[in-house]
């Protein structure tokens, strides 16, 4: 049985929230850390999918979905000591409509394949291997994005694998917060439209925003990739940027629930040397 929560509005940041001036790791945020600020447009729906794992209700992933574009604005989730587990293999569950959103607002198989695009997972199947049920949820069409095969199986897959490696390094005191998406909001960041249907944009860019709480320390980094058959580089380090720079490109406020001192410090800069395997 799939447990689903639908929610149209959520207060992400409350200006009255207390601030931890010392950036104490036990009081570093005022809300769900991985969630970006919601746009809350007329066609936007916020959804979180859950499963029951080891007798506990566990968040699978969350999204802000734009019904007018039949595409998620972003997908957010976390790796921790529980969700990092690899207990199953990819299910190849039949791709299916997301039961949390009307099927008329979702893409279908005909929008991919012969159109020249893979059904590219945003939350990758390999990101969610701790149970069969959670892996099946990654095959919802709300989690799909039209990706060129060479991109989907090339540099994007390389980045996904690196992020999974970081995520699976988590111990009981660690959490890797992940946001992924494709650009659907700005006309100059749209590659085209499936069958010239403006309700089915093709992202020109894909991105990730990462925040790693490792014990009592924090680090953050972002990645921005053009959606092309011929990547500018095969080195992930060449796609790295700061969270602030990614926010400027996307117009999305990432990790807004962090206390302000920590958010400002983490998002302004990044160190590629701090991320094993990146250099």
Region locations from a protein language model:
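Single conserved hydrophobic/aromatic residue that forms the stacking wall/gate
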Residues: 1-14
């Amino acid at each position: 049985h799939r447990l689903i929560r639908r929610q149209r509005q959520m207060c992400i940041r409350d200006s009255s929230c207390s601030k931890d001036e010392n950036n104490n790791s036990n009081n570093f945020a005022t809300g769900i850390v991985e969630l970006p600020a919601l746009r809350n447009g007329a066609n936007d729906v916020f959804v979180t999918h859950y499963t029951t794992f080891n007798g506990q209700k566990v968040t699978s992933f969350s999204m802000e979905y734009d019904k007018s574009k039949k595409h998620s604005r972003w997908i957010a989730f976390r790796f921790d000591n529980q969700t990092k587990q690899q207990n199953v293999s990819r299910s190849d569950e039949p791709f299916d409509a997301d039961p949390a959103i009307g099927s008329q607002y979702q893409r279908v198989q005909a929008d991919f394949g012969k159109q020249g695009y893979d059904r590219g997972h945003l939350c990758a199947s390999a990101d969610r291997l701790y149970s069969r049920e959670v892996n099946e949820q990654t095959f919802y069409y709300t989690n799909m994005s039209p990706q060129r095969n060479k991109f989907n199986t090339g540099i994007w897959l390389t980045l996904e694998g690196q992020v999974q490696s970081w995520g699976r390094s988590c111990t009981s005191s660690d959490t890797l917060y992940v946001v992924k998406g494709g650009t659907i909001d700005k006309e100059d960041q749209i590659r085209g439209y499936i069958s010239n249907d403006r309700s089915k944009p093709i992202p020109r860019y894909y991105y990730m925003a990462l925040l790693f709480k490792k014990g009592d320390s924090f680090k953050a980094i972002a990645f921005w990739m053009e959606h092309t058959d011929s990547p500018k580089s095969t080195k992930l380090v060449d796609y790295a940027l700061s969270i602030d720079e990614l926010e400027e490109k996307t117009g999305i406020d990432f990790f807004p629930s962090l206390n302000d001192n920590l958010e400002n410090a983490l998002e302004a800069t990044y160190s590629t040397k701090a991320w094993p395997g990146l250099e």
